[in-house]
Structures are given as C-alpha cells and as structure tokens.
C-alpha cells in the first residue's frame, strides 16, 4: 500500500483535477504514471447527459475497437447443427447446448463472453442467475444473441467491448493497453464515442457527452478536452 500511496501522490502532484487536458497530453500523463510491472489497461469513463433511472435513457450496446483491446478473449457459444460448425470455424473456444449449460451450472466457466443463437434461449434463459451477475448473459442489444453466431464470435475475438450506463449515467470501458500507440488508443476512443453518439436516447436533453476521462488500471483519472478528439 505504501508504494501505491507514493504513486498516487506523485500522480496528483502532476495532474490538475480541475483541468481538461488535450488527448495527447492526457495519455502521456497516464502512461508516465502507469508504473506497474504489467501492461496496464487504459480505461475510459464517459459521463452522459441521461437519467439512468429511466429505462428509455439507459445507453447499452457494443462496438468493435479498430485496434483491439490487447486482451485474449475466450468465447463460449450456444448453438447446434450448422451454426455450431460456423461458430467453431470462427474461433469459438467452447460450443455446446445442454452439456455447456451443465458445465456452467457446475461453476466451470473458462470463458469471458457467452454468445447464443436465438433458438437456444430456452436453455440459456435458465442460466440468468449465474451469467447475469457476471455480466455474461447473452443479450440482443449487445449482439450476443444473434442468428449470425460466426460474426459475433469474430467480433468478440477482434476486440469488441460492451458498454452500459451505470446508475450515475456513466459508461466505463477499456480502450487498450499502456503499450498501445497514442494513435491506436485514439482510434479506439473515437470508435466508442461514435457508438455512444449513435446510441443517444431520443429523450436525452441538453449536453449528451458531458465529461470524458482516461485512467490506467492502477491510476487516477485525467479529464480529456473533447475538442481535441477530432479524428
């Protein structure tokens, strides 16, 4: 904890929390202070102008980041017949039906994402209490319930991230790693921002993208000047 405290103090000494930094400067600060012995993730928080308590203003979806996430993703798929073969060919790590459901009920879940063909939801629906709390329950809104399981698998493997507003109307997502170039991080950030703009609820009023902040796994946040995010 002592090392963490020193690092946090050093970070706070360099960052003006009342200031919004140009994107390049924000990334430079974060990378400079990301001194952990592993390749820290670069995370984004976006404060949206929505009332997350209203169901019609919940922003939820997914987007494939052009530069990926830097993470190896393991995918499980519920499918049968031809679709099962397509999922395997696309790179799915596990494909099954009742056998996969029993594996999940037993607590054996060596995967990060679950994808399901619509006709398998009679089985998948019984797993809500297990998959739901882990954020892995398939949902058509994020593209994980789909007849095109092959494309869903490819997207997941290519660096697709899911997003959803929390109770405060904030989106949290990972846009890469410390080892990524600034250009790669920016392309990923812009892809996410574009997806959020397209998902803007019709009932949202006033400023929609209120605040954008970046941080590393072990670091504090740096606010980003949105005017510097032009492609």
Curated annotation (Swiss-Prot):
GO biological process: regulation of translation; translation
Protein name: Large ribosomal subunit protein uL1
Organism the protein comes from: Janthinobacterium sp. (strain Marseille)
Gene assigned in the entry: rplA
Domain of life assignment: Bacteria
Subunit structure, as described in the record: Part of the 50S ribosomal subunit.
InterPro entries on file: Ribosom_uL1_bac-type (IPR005878), Ribosomal_uL1 (IPR002143), Ribosomal_uL1-like (IPR023674), Ribosomal_uL1/biogenesis (IPR028364), Ribosomal_uL1_3-a/b-sand (IPR016095), Ribosomal_uL1_CS (IPR023673)
CDD domains: Ribosomal_L1
Family recorded in the similarity comment: Belongs to the universal ribosomal protein uL1 family.
């Amino acid at each position: 904890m002592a090392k963490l405290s020193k690092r946090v103090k050093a970070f706070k000494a360099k960052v003006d929390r009342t200031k919004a930094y140009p994107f390049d400067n924000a990334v430079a600060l974060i990378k400079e202070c990301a001194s952990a012995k592993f390749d820290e993730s670069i995370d984004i928080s976006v404060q949206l102008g929505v009332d997350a308590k209203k169901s019609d203003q919940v922003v939820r979806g997914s987007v494939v980041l052009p530069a990926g996430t830097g993470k190896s993703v393991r995918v499980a798929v519920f499918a049968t017949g031809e679709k099962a073969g397509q999922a395997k060919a696309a790179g799915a790590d596990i494909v099954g039906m009742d056998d996969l459901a029993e594996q999940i009920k037993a607590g054996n879940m060596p995967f990060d994402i679950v994808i399901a063909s619509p006709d398998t939801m009679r089985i998948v629906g019984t797993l809500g209490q297990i998959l739901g709390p882990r954020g892995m329950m398939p949902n058509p809104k994020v593209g994980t319930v789909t007849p095109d399981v092959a494309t869903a698998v490819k997207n997941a493997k290519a660096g697709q991230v899911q997003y959803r507003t929390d109770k405060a109307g904030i989106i949290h997502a990972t846009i890469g790693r410390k080892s990524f170039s600034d250009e790669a991080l920016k392309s990923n950030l812009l892809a996410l921002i574009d997806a959020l703009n397209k998902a803007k609820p019709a009932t949202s009023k006033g400023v929609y993208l209120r605040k954008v902040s970046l941080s590393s796994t072990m670091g504090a946040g740096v606010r980003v000047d949105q005017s510097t995010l032009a492609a």
